[in-house]
Amino acid sequence: MAAQNGNASFPANFSIPQEHASSLPFNFSYDDYDLPLDEDEDMTKTQTFFAAKIVIGVALVGIMLTCGIGNFVFITALTRYKKLRNLTNLLIANLAISDFLVAIICCPFEMDYYVVHQLSWEHGHVLCACINYLRTVSLYVSTNALLAIAIDRYLAIVHPLKPRMNYQTASFLIALVWMVSILISIPSAYFTKETVLFIVKNQKKIFCGQVWPVDQQLYYKSYFLFVFGIEFLGPVFTMTLCYARISRELWFKAVPGFQTEQIRKRLRCRRKTVLVLMCILTAYVLCWAPFYGFTIVRDFFPTVFVKEKHYLTAFYVVECIAMSNSMINTVCFVTVKNSTMKYFKKMLLLHWRPSHHGSKSSADLDLKTSRLPATEEVDCIRLK
C-alpha cells in the first residue's frame, strides 16, 4: 500500500515462489510488516505497532488538513487573481495540485489501510494500483517542479539579460514535468498486486503493494537506481548548484550604480523568495534522504535488518519524516512565499459582502488586469 517512496524485499525466513516483493516507490512489503509468520503472534497487536499506528495516523491527518486546505486556498486564489499568476507561481501550482490530489484521494485510503484495518487492504486491486500510482506520480511531479523553479530563478537572477521564460515555454515545461512523472511511475501500477497473508491461524491480511518476479530482481534494482538518480540525486545536485550561484549573486556581489528604493525592494523580495526556496530544498533533502538511504540498505544489503526487533518502528519513523515534506511545502508556499491568504480573504469578503455593487473595488480590478501578469518582483514590491 502507498506510504512513501521506497522498495522492499522479503525477509530471509519467508518467500513466495516466483515473486520478489518490492515497493518502489510507495509501498510496504511483507518484511515491512515485520510479521514472523512462524510464530503464533500477530505483530499488529503489539505495543510497538500500536505506537507506530498512532504516529502514521497523526501524520496522515496532518497531510489531509494542511495539504488539502492549504493547496485548495492557493489554487483557488491563483485561479481567481491574475496578479498571482507569475511564472514561479504557475510552477508552484503543479506541486499544489499534486499534493492536493494526494490529500483528498490517497490519504483517506491510506488511513483506512494503516489505522482502521491495520495493514490490510479492503478496496480491490484496481484502487490498490491507482492509489499507489497517484502517490508515485505526485512525488515525481513535486521533485520535477522544484527543479524547474530552481532553474527559472537561476536564469532570472544570474542571467537577467537573457530572455525570460515565456508562457509557451512554461506550458511546455509543465507538460514535460507531468509527462515524465506519469511515464516513470508506470511500473508502480503495473507490478502492484493484492496478496493474502495468513498471520495467525485463520486470521488474514491483504497486502497491497508492488511484487516483482524473482527473475526480474536485476531489473527492479536497475529501475530503482535509475529513479534514485534522476528523481533524487540529479535534482538535488542541480538545485544546490542553482541556489549556490543565486546566493552568490544576491548576497555577495556588489550592485553597481545608485540604488533606488525600488531596486532595494526588488533585492529584498528576491532574497526572501530564494531563502524560502532554499529552505524547501533543505527540507526535501532532510525528509527524503533517510528514506532513500533506508531503502537502499534494505534492498541491497538485506542482512542488515535480519532479526532486527525494531525494524518496523524505524521504518515508520523514517516514513513519517518523508511524508511531512508535503506539509512543509504547503506551509512555505502558501503562508510565506505568496500573498495567497491576502487574496483569499479578499475573495471571501467579496462573496459575503454583495453591497459593493456600486463601485469597483481593487479586488474586482484584479480580475481585469492585463493578460501579461506582473513579474514576481514587481508584484512583490506592489504588495509591500
Curated annotation (Swiss-Prot):
Cytoplasmic topological segments: 75-89, 159-171, 245-273, 335-384
Stretches assigned to the Extracellular side: 1-53, 111-137, 193-223, 295-313
The UniProt record lists the keyword Cell membrane: yes
Name listed for the protein in its UniProt record: Prokineticin receptor 2
Record field: transmembrane: 54-74, 90-110, 138-158, 172-192, 224-244, 274-294, 314-334
Keyword terms: Cell membrane, Disulfide bond, G-protein coupled receptor, Glycoprotein, Membrane, Receptor, Transducer, Transmembrane, Transmembrane helix
Subcellular location(s) per record: Cell membrane
GO cellular component: plasma membrane
Quaternary structure annotation from Swiss-Prot or TrEMBL: Homodimer.
Organism: Bos taurus
Family: Belongs to the G-protein coupled receptor 1 family.
The keyword Disulfide bond is annotated on this UniProt entry: yes
Membrane topology annotation: Multi-pass membrane protein
Annotated glycan sites: N7, N13, N27
GO-annotated molecular function: G protein-coupled receptor activity; neuropeptide Y receptor activity
PANTHER family: G-PROTEIN COUPLED RECEPTOR, PROKINETICIN RECEPTOR 2
Function of the protein: Receptor for prokineticin 2. Exclusively coupled to the G(q) subclass of heteromeric G proteins. Activation leads to mobilization of calcium, stimulation of phosphoinositide turnover and activation of p44/p42 mitogen-activated protein kinase.
Superkingdom per UniProt: Eukaryota
Disulfide bonds: C128-C208
